[in-house]
């Protein structure tokens, strides 16, 4: 959605009761209050960059949910007595704009930390900068493998399953169910796409090479459609289609496969399994798609009585009435902001960037309200893998049938 403003500021305070989904965790007790830039006796300032405009604007709702949640907390009380000022800036999924917005957050606004920013390419552009400044870059909406490098880039942590983990699991699934598969792949022409592609192909090679990739097609985020790529793939003889796309390209490609009458086994990257994306493609067109799952869906009968989904729905009705109940991207944003609030709660009166990082790396075992039962964060100070418990799932035309047992790479 086109946005006129790139900065919005909300002040918020939190009551501990609003974090009902959080696992118990001790507060940091300190003889003296300690602060980094962005924190004081009365305020905690956070930042974020997401595409509120441009080709990735579908994901701008992540920032809107963050605003709403902090506003709700503001109306309730306080995270250890402090208000939250949250600045979500528009980077239009552009690396140069992300650099500009991030520098503004750090150098002008002096935020304590950034959380929930989106996109492998934009976040790569500010990766070294934020680490050189010692500013936490947490719960990134990207699962690039580079974010798991606590030795060299300790200030950066992914918030999604790492893409290579997901790709390896899907490759093993293909080898198991179609050992002689002929695979066509459509992938985003950037680090995001390649982070899936290479480990997927490596698993096929390690399995003996009977299942093999016979055609690869790429697309750029600025491409108006992916129709020509899908036509090429459909004519290639491929009987498996690995769809490594995001946003509107995911919806377009699923719909185009159906229009072409092509009937491959379809694999879809987990970040594109939300109901808003599938609804745009047509649920009937998405039937049979296989994907990795780690999270619940909002707005579906299966989860309507789930306490976490009910918490999101309460927020949505009160603060985000224009957001659809089944917007899984918005629900993901809810899980992230609840987690960020938990990190701040654990910091107590030691609101330094070092302690924010310490509490984030200590989230092992914390269950985000977005996660499926049994899935928790697996972060440790030495391993920033966000989660290691994942599930294979198949879309049945209405909902996801999720495997009984978790899988790993």
Which sequence ranges carry the predicted segments?
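N-terminal secretory signal peptides
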Residues: 1-29
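Immediate post-signal peptide segment of exported/extracytoplasmic ligand-binding proteins
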Residues: 30-45, 80-83, 175-180
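Beta-alpha junction/loop-to-helix N-cap segments that form part of ligand/metal-binding clefts
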Residues: 32-34, 58-64, 76-149, 159, ...
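Extracytoplasmic "Venus flytrap"
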Residues: 35-40, 47-66, 89-96, 118-119, ...
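Hydrophobic alpha-helical segments within soluble ligand-binding/sensing domains
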Residues: 98, 159-181, 225-227, 250, ...
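Extracytoplasmic ligand/sensor domains, especially the bilobed periplasmic-binding protein
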Residues: 110-216, 266-294
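Extracellular/periplasmic periplasmic-binding protein-like sensory domains
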Residues: 254-333, 402-408
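Segments of small-molecule ligand-sensing domains
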Residues: 318-331, 339-400
């Amino acid at each position: 959605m086109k946005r006129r403003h790139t900065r919005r500021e909300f002040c918020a305070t939190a009551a501990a009761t609003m974090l009902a989904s959080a696992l118990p965790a001790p507060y940091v007790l300190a003889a003296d209050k300690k602060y980094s830039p962005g924190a004081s006796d009365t305020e905690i300032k956070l930042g974020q960059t997401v595409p509120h405009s441009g080709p990735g604007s579908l994901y701008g709702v992540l920032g809107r949910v963050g605003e709403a949640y902090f506003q709700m907390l503001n109306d309730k009380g306080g995270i250890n007595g402090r208000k939250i000022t949250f600045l979500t800036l528009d980077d239009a999924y552009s690396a140069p704009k992300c650099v500009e917005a991030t520098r503004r957050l750090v150098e002008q606004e002096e935020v304590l930390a950034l959380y929930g920013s989106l996109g492998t390419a934009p976040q790569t552009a500010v990766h070294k900068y934020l680490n050189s400044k010692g500013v936490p870059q947490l719960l990134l909406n990207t699962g690039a493998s580079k974010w798991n490098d606590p030795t060299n880039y300790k200030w950066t942590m992914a918030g999604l399953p790492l893409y290579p983990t997901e790709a390896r699991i899907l490759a093993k699934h293909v080898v198991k169910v179609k050992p002689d598969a002929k695979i066509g792949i459509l992938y985003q022409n950037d680090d995001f796409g390649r982070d899936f592609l290479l480990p997927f192909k490596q698993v096929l090679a390690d399995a003996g090479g009977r299942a093999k990739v016979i055609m690869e097609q790429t697309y750029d985020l600025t491409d108006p459609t992916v129709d020509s790529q899908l036509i090429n793939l459909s004519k290639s003889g491929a009987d498996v289609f690995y769809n490594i796309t995001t946003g509107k390209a995911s919806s377009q490609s699923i719909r185009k496969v159906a229009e072409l009458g092509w009937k491959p086994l379809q694999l879809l990257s987990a970040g594109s399994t939300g109901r808003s994306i599938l609804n745009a493609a047509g649920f009937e067109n998405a039937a049979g798609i296989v994907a990795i799952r780690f999270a619940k869906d909002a707005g579906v009968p299966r989860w309507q009585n789930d306490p976490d989904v009910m918490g999101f729905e309460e927020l949505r009705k009160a603060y985000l009435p224009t957001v659809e109940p089944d917007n899984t991207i918005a629900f993901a944003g809810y899980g992230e902001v609840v987690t960020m609030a938990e990190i701040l709660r654990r910091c107590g009166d030691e609101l330094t960037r070092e302690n924010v990082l310490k509490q984030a790396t200590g989230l092992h075992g914390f269950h985000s309200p977005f996660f499926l039962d049994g899935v928790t964060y697996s972060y440790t100070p030495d391993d920033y893998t966000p989660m290691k418990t994942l599930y294979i799932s198949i879309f049945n035309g209405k909902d996801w049938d999720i495997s009984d047992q978790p899988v790993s790479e």
